[in-house]
UniProtKB/Swiss-Prot annotation:
Keywords: 4Fe-4S, Cytoplasm, Disulfide bond, Iron, Iron-sulfur, Metal-binding, Methyltransferase, rRNA processing, S-adenosyl-L-methionine, Transferase, tRNA processing. Its EC number is 2.1.1.192. Its cofactor is [4Fe-4S] cluster. Belongs to the radical SAM superfamily. RlmN family. The active site is at residues 95, 350. The lineage of its organism: Bacteria, Pseudomonadati, Pseudomonadota, Betaproteobacteria, Burkholderiales. This is Dual-specificity RNA methyltransferase RlmN. It catalyses: adenosine(2503) in 23S rRNA + 2 reduced [2Fe-2S]-[ferredoxin] + 2 S-adenosyl-L-methionine = 2-methyladenosine(2503) in 23S rRNA + 5'-deoxyadenosine + L-methionine + 2 oxidized [2Fe-2S]-[ferredoxin] + S-adenosyl-L-homocysteine; adenosine(37) in tRNA + 2 reduced [2Fe-2S]-[ferredoxin] + 2 S-adenosyl-L-methionine = 2-methyladenosine(37) in tRNA + 5'-deoxyadenosine + L-methionine + 2 oxidized [2Fe-2S]-[ferredoxin] + S-adenosyl-L-homocysteine. Reaction proceeds by a ping-pong mechanism involving intermediate methylation of a conserved cysteine residue. It is found in: Cytoplasm. InterPro entries: Aldolase_TIM (IPR013785), Methyltransferase_A (IPR040072), RlmN_N (IPR048641), RNA_MTrfase_RlmN (IPR027492), rRNA_lsu_MTrfase_RlmN/Cfr (IPR004383), rSAM (IPR007197). Binds 1 [4Fe-4S] cluster. The cluster is coordinated with 3 cysteines and an exchangeable S-adenosyl-L-methionine.
Amino acid sequence: MTSETTVNLLDFDAEGLVAYCGSLGEKPFRAKQLQRWIHQYNAGDFDGMTDLAKSLREKLKGRASIGMPEIASDHVSTDGTRKWLIDVGNGNAVETVFIPEETRGTLCVSSQAGCAVNCRFCSTGKQGFSRNLSTAEIIGQLRMAEFALRASLGRAPGPNGKAERVVTNVVMMGMGEPLLNYSAVVPAMRLMLDDNAYGLSRRRVTLSTSGVVPMMDRLGAELPVALAVSLHAPNDPLRDELVPLNKKYPLRELMAACQRYLKVAPRDFITFEYCMLDGVNDTEAHARELLAVTRDVPCKFNLIPFNPFPESGLIRSKPEQIKRFAQVLIDAGVVTTVRKTRGDDIDAACGQLAGAVKDRTRLAERTGAAGKIIEVRAI
């Protein structure tokens, strides 16, 4: 936790850090130096920033800090997925999940403590909404994960070349609706893309939204990254039930927003995420209806087997039904994947990011809810 009298430098993107250095009477190049020390060399204090003038280091000591997330627990799944539970104060916790694969390492980042959208199939929404995360709390998840993973592999901090980087992709798919925390999420994503910080390409940063149409347009104008849309239903009555935000931004408006976004997006398609719910949205008729509603949007489908939790009253679609549903889409020429469930033994699978505890304020119980905390090993 940082002192209330100091500024957390993790809250600044490049432009903000230049402005802050200017307020100290320093030139813009000092901001780049600071940014590299913080985001590439994992500096925890100012004494080791040897290319900064001693006078600047002394100024920073009295005015600024590099505040990092407080890790409450650190779990590794049997499949290599790693989940950090982060204490964000006042009994609230968020989760960050790293998914290792042969050709990439994907970090799933949270943007809010809880979520107000309250999708019926997502356990995070059932814990209610507490607050938005700050830019520091969002980018701090990437900083914490990248350097923890490097340490586990014996890799030293330093400029993020391809050979050194562990996190190659970031997905804003953790707890919360990112576009309802726009003012903090966008500076964090700017840092993810900045060559003086993490240097990821726009194609490797994906924001997932339940469909906040005005903010989709704003994101397209200001920082178009890869976009995923939590669709989950092929018609308005069903989506109203599963994704309550649909009552405000129905499918016709959402599809139009997707078309507008694609004019500026780094990828030439939208990824539509679709949680497979037995007897609810998983028939071949639903698949055909889905093709019709998305016909004017270049897209691919990511079918997500539902991860059950007691309060939902829902059941995962049977594997054979998921295959039949997918085949309808594939036969129509649409790229379709079925998400492999990862990290479900540590409650890190999609839709499980509330863990096993209903009350989001019971951090002590929740810390151990996913099972025994095991020794972190190399991935």
